[in-house]
Structure formats: structure tokens, C-alpha cells
Amino acid sequence: MEISSEILTPATTDKHPLIGTPLVVPIIICIFTGVIGGAAYSAVVTVSLPASLVLGGIYGLVFAVLCHRRAVSPGAGLIWGLGFALLLWLVVRAGIVPVIAEGMSAIGRVDFLRAQFPQLVAYVLLLGMPLGIVLGIWGGLQVRPTQAAFSFRRALVGGGLAGCVGGWVFGRWMDKVDLFPVLGGLVNSHTRASGLAVHSLVAIVIGASFGLLFQRDIRGYGSSLGWGMAYGILWWFLGPMTILPLLQGRPLDWSYQHGSALFGSFVGHIVFGLIVGLTYAVADRLWVGFFTDSDPINREPEGPGARTVYSLGWGAAASLAGGLLFSLVMLATGALPRVARLVGGTSPLLGFVVHLVISAIIGMSYGLLFRREAPDKGSGVAWGLLYGLVWWFLGPLTLYPILLGGSLTWTTQAAGLALPSLIGHLMYGAATALAFIVLERRHDEWIRLDPRLAAREVRLRRPIGTPAPALWLFVLGLGVLLPILLG
């Protein structure tokens, strides 16, 4: 299920059209941006200003050297920036600092990691985000013949529509917890109607910015979920953790205690991001299909109906491996009787059957969403882990309590109780994705016999060199880490 057939690859040359040594320009830009970020970091986290300036400049230099060829657009640069910011925090604040302070025994201690939570927010917002966007803007100005054309109108319309849909869903939870009057206070009107208007406007703006940033990176419905999830996490840091208190005239509070109090908003932003990503991908595919796509020569070797049936079948078959692995976790934690409650029973055997049916449905959805996303088995496992994480947020924290007649349980208590299920969801996603790509590749072997069809198949797959690795690091890292730290 591809969104576009263009190849998205980094430039094949390092040469800038105007400057003989192109690396000098991004290095200067990133050092300057890193120094500014270091100054802001010093002011917010209250550490030594000279040290922050030097470290910010060094980080900007390293980021420019490593990512100047990969940050081919502002969106790609942003994802690389977020991934490297999390990596920096893991190495420095979660690795080196604990060892220096208390020795090797301090590594991985939750209390120590919680104490470093303000630095995590600062690294993401003050270093990763600005460095990524600035370097991506520079990269987007370079001439790359193989890069897909950008449509400003398509990005705004599709993104705005996605923001409307995501905002409507997120707004249901916000209305339940009475947050609209709080947003209405930003325009001096503490009413539900004014808060709803502010929320809707912000959702549309975020959706439109998603389209502007990531139009060239969104190739399939599955990967769009990942990009949307990453953008939702970023906006949780940026919105309720930062912009909202500043607009209300309150000091910034990036402590883990404040983050824990906003855990419901964290899950809500993830769900919002998932809906924005998927809705944008659908809208973008429809736009391209109706107004852009025309390729009478390079026809698909199979019709859309056959491709859909194959994807559903492979997904259902692959889910058997993931579902059986997940059932081991459920058996160990005694979760099968709770699953049986979905159909009015309590038997572990009934729960196992219901679990396999749900696994097959999710596996079929994986087949529809993620076909042609992975160029190799390693990439397939990464997408599978991400999809398993997606269903941990959508399943036990969102849909399961609703199906039992309850309400959303976006609380740290519910997340803590569901942590064993998180392990099971990750195992399920990885095993299902690995089995799926094996089945998919076995079927596609006959296509590779024709050089023309083989070349088209390669062109339709996500190429190596996109920001996907940084996306996996950022989403999987924070998607697993934050429920533990904030719980």
C-alpha cells in the first residue's frame, strides 16, 4: 500500500551548487543553532552557561557531520534531530552521568532516570528539534533530481483534514476531563465553546504542519502511523509541557512529576498523532490518485483486489506466530480470563480463542498497512515493534475498557498494570512482521524473474536512507520509556 512511487533518496553528491566545500555551510548553521540551544538549555535547566554553549556547539558540529546528507527536507531533518536528541540523552544523562555519580549500579535505575527527565525534554526541544529543522531547511534548498515534487496545496488540505479528524477524537477525552475551559482561558473566555474553538484551530494547524513537514516521507499507510506517533509525542513536549504554561504566565515545569500528571494528555497526543498520520496518508493517496497519478506504461503485475487479498492472508497467517508468543505472556500474567470477558465469559480457553481472533484481525491490518514498507527483515521487525507499541496504546489503554462498557483509562495506574502486556505487544509485533515479510518475499520471487517488474517493485519499496531508523529510535524509545518513568 504505497503512497507514492517516487524514490526518496539522499543526494548522491556532497557538492553545493554555490560553494566548493558544502559541509562548511551546514556545520556553521548547526554550530550556531547548537550554541543558541545551549544558551536556552542553561537558562531552563540552570546549569553553567559557558559549558552549555560549548557542548551545544560541539553537538551541532557532530549532528551536521552525521546528518547533512540525510536531512533532505525539514521533516526528515526533524526526525533525525529527535532521534539523535534521544540518543544523546541515553548516552549522557542515562549512561555517563549515573556512572560518574554512583557507579555502574546506577545505570537503569528508575529514580535516577526520573531525575534526568527535565534534561530529556530540554534535549528534545532545545537541541534536537531546532537543529533538525534548520539542517532540514538547508537540505531542502539543495537541488536533488530524484527527490519527489512537493505540493504545498496538497499538504495543507490533507494535513488540515487529518488535524480535524484527530482533533475531534482527542477532543472527546478533553471534554470528559473538562480541559476546554482551560484552553478557553487563553482567549480570556473560560467557556467550553471557546476552548473547543481554540482546540480545533490548534489541531488543524498541527495537522497542516504535519503535511508540510512529512509529505515527502509518507510512503505508506503503516509508516504514516509511525510519523504521526512521533509528531504526537513531540507536540506533547511542546504543547502542554511548554507552550501552554508559558501562555498562562506560569513558569516551566519539566519535572517527571508534572509529566506524570499529564500522562492522560500524553496518551491523547499519541492517539491524535496516529489518527493524523493515517488520515493524512489516506487523503494524500486519494489526492494523488484523482489529480496526479498517471502511469499507463508501468502497470502493476497484480490488481488491487489480488494485492489486498494476499496482504490480508499473509497478515492473518503471520499473526499466528505473534499471537502464540503473546499468549505465553498472557498465560503467565493470568490475563486470558480478562480477555474472555469481551464475549461475556471467564474461561482461559475462551480467552485464548478470542485472543487469537484479535491477533488475526490486527495481523490482517498489518498486512494492509505495511506492505512494501520494509526493504529487509530487520526493517520489518522494527516496523512490527512499532505496530505492537501502537496497539498497546490503542488496546488495553483505550479500546479494551470501552468494549467492557467502561471509559478511557489514560492514567499512570492503568499503564502500570498493563506493562506486562506491553512486552507481549512488542513480541507480537516483531514476530508477526518477521513472518509477514518472509511470506511476502516468497510470493514476490516470481516477480523478480521479469527485470522490468523487479525494478518497479524495488522502486515501490521504502529505500534505505530515509529517516525511518531515527523514527524507530524516537518512537520506540519514548513509547516504552515514558510509561515507565511517569508511572
List PLM regions with ranges.
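Juxtamembrane/disordered regions of integral membrane proteins
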Residues: 2-487
